[in-house]
Amino acid sequence: SQVFDAAIRQAEEALDLTSVSELSMALPAAYEALKAAVETYTEGLCAGWTPGEEVDLTWLLVNPDFSEGSKGWEGTSFTAASSGVAEFYDKTYDTYQVLERMPAGTYRFRAQGFYRYGDKAEAYDAHQDGSEQLLAGLYLNSSRQTFMSLFDGSAPYTYNPYTYPDDVRSADNAFNRDGEYRANEVEYELLAKGDLRVGLDKTEYRYHDWNCFDNFKLLYVAK
């Protein structure tokens, strides 16, 4: 579009400058122009759909599938971001991305993922006897939803023999080979144009607990 073309030209012209004083003025202006271009494009993309349709805005997220490790994610560092997934183990955390100048409306943030409430034996027992607590969650600004249990009844795995995911490699297989652990979604209504903070957190410590996840998606619900 013309807006993007103009912003890119402005950025290229800024990069051609050589003096520090010129660069210090031109680069911030070029960055603001690029952000404005993304804002205009996003607003146009979210308009003109049938009410209730989902518009995929995942392209606004940096590295939503962890194919580039932890790139793009702020806050608490992942325990690991390898084998195409990311994880937190035995810690509290708050990890997120902030999307600026988003159009007003309803958003949905989804992921494949699960939470294990401690060591696998005690977590399984807690799931079976109803004492399990799902401490890890997805959030969109002030809305939050917990991750599903590793031992959720929809998962086609067994405890004996143990075939549930037990490391990042087997979690990657569960997500990307088997297509499991998809029931993780949070919804938030942004009442006016503004920022969206999308992330995941856990504020309560639990010994040897585990949260593993992949394939984040951001969707706008057309109105």
What are these regions (language model features)?
Residues 71-75, 88-90, 103-104, 114-132, ...:
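Extended, low-complexity, turn-rich repeat/linker tracts enriched in Gly/Pro/Ser/Thr and Asp/Glu
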Residues 66, 93-124, 184-190, 216:
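Extra-cytoplasmic beta-strand recognition segments
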Residues 187-202:
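Noncatalytic modules at the cell exterior or secretory-pathway interfaces
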Residues 172-177, 199-209:
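Short beta-strand-plus-loop segments that form exposed binding edges in beta-rich domains
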Residues 62-93:
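Extracellular glycan-recognition surfaces and repeat-rich motifs
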Residues 1-60:
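Beta-rich interaction/scaffold domains
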Residues 206-223:
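Exposed low-complexity, polar/acidic, P/S/T/G-rich flexible segments that act as propeptides
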Residues 115-173:
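Extracellular ligand-binding interfaces
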